[in-house]
UniProtKB/Swiss-Prot annotation:
Protein name from the UniProt record: Probable endonuclease 4
Residues the record lists as binding Zn(2+) 3: 182, 229, 231
Obligatory cofactor(s): Zn(2+)
NCBIfam families: nfo (TIGR00587), PRK01060.1-4 (NF002199)
Pfam families in the record: AP_endonuc_2
Enzyme class: hydrolase
Species the sequence originates in: Campylobacter curvus (strain 525.92)
Protein's job: Endonuclease IV plays a role in DNA repair. It cleaves phosphodiester bonds at apurinic or apyrimidinic (AP) sites, generating a 3'-hydroxyl group and a 5'-terminal sugar phosphate.
EC number of the protein: 3.1.21.2
GO molecular-function term, one example from the UniProt record: DNA-(apurinic or apyrimidinic site) endonuclease activity
Amino acid sequence: MRYIGAHVSASGGVQNAPLNAAKIGANAFALFVKNQRQWSAKPLESAAISEFEQNCKAANISPRHILPHDSYLINLGHYDDAKREQSFNAFVDEIERVSELGLELLNFHPGSHLNEISQNECLNLIAECMNEALKRTDGVKLVIENTAGQGSNLGFRFEQLAYLIERTDDKSRVGVCIDTCHAFAAGYDLRTPEAYKKTMDEFDAVIGYEFLSAMHLNDCKFGLNSRKDRHESLGKGFLGLKAFECIMNDEHIGEIPMILETIDDSIWADEIKILRNLQKGKK
């Protein structure tokens, strides 16, 4: 079984996200558990939490197939101690909110060195924050997303993700989310069965399929190794549908959330159908 959805709106309250997922025929979804462009937010209300859980059950969507995404403001690798602490505190707050909702995953971008410190120094700061966050919280798995390599963002090479995993004390609470657009933009080809196998064999050798906890399924507006993070609708970008056919039929991929972040939410329901039709045997 493939668990496919999109990053849906939680406007009006988190309880609305599963309703929006159900409208597009999803059996997985992503959401922000607070405003992604503000540092602080009022606590989740117990009524909203209860309604969220009820709506997930009504939509027949399991907590393990829901992928909360953290705030875009957070940079766990910030060179400035005070700004990194602000990011860390916001990160812990996000984990606690995810836990309150009864969810198991938190997807996040590793961080940026901002051309002020070395890549390794930045990665070490991120790992320190991850370990401290794990000590202060329970249950939630930290799911590191690969990046396109734009600007000073880290996480665009599999080796950088592996570096963070290696330095995480509790390996049971760390995983990876592969964003197909980001991977392609960072130089990992997925366009043919041969290219896909080469890239995923490298992923398995460097990181391991056992750490693959989620995927973002996005086509790409720019070509291979562009280092530009610009998503496109499935089959309308430089990746093409063959890449997604390979993913849908990759028996090494477990029952993880597969999330669309494509640019036209009016066709998400159609894109979910496209993905299901690409799967041989339609499991």
